[in-house]
Amino acid sequence: MDTRAFDAGVILSALPQLLEFLDITLLVGISSIVLGSLLGGDLAWAKLSQHKILNYLAQLYIYIMRCTPSIVMLFIVFYGLPALVEAVFEENIHDMDRAVFAIIAFTLLFSAYVSEIFRAAYKAVPQGQYEAAISIGISPWGAFWHIMLPQTAVLALPNFGNSVINLLKEGALAYTIGLIDMIGKGNLIIAQNFGAYGIEIYLACMIIYWLMSIGIEKAFGLLEQRLDKGQLFSSKAGKKQAVFILKEGEASGAGL
């Protein structure tokens, strides 16, 4: 048991050492967010589709992932994926970078959560607007891109931002498979000091995560304001087209 007196100076001296490994933490987090969002979008589409098999498989996947603790999924991927690949393809991936295993695990988990966010946000947008756009000759893709997607993004953004922050914090578990990220480096510093300064090191980690969470929260707040003001459209013509379609939908009674 560490009986040393608390030393605030250790926090300041540890911060630069921890920040050297922040890029690994961000690599795992950002990669998982991007890949998880893409997979989550596909899952949301599958749940919204009329195809019974796709709908059932998406529901099953989401249910399993949402019921699986993050650390359990991390271990399943880290220990199970190499065994599976070796059994099926006779390839040895045991020496693969541990960041890859972490990204795979967190991608699978993140996709399940954001798929429900995307699906709920899309269903909250009046579908009559899409039908009105189609009725006046807009292509299905154009109606989705210019009408449905911007409104869906605004509705999904707050919960999506919370999920991003949660994923960033869950990523701290990656050290359990030997990944030397920010938390992994913190544990190495503690080990090098024979278990001393644990409180100070973890407080330093907490400060970094706290600042990152505040930054992400502020960034999503600004993005939400931009989307609310209709600044997602890249041109005035695109905005005018969207407004025209919305008005047509309301006039025809197909909208709200």
Outline where the language-model segments fall.
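Transmembrane alpha-helices and adjacent helix-loop boundaries
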Residues: 1-256
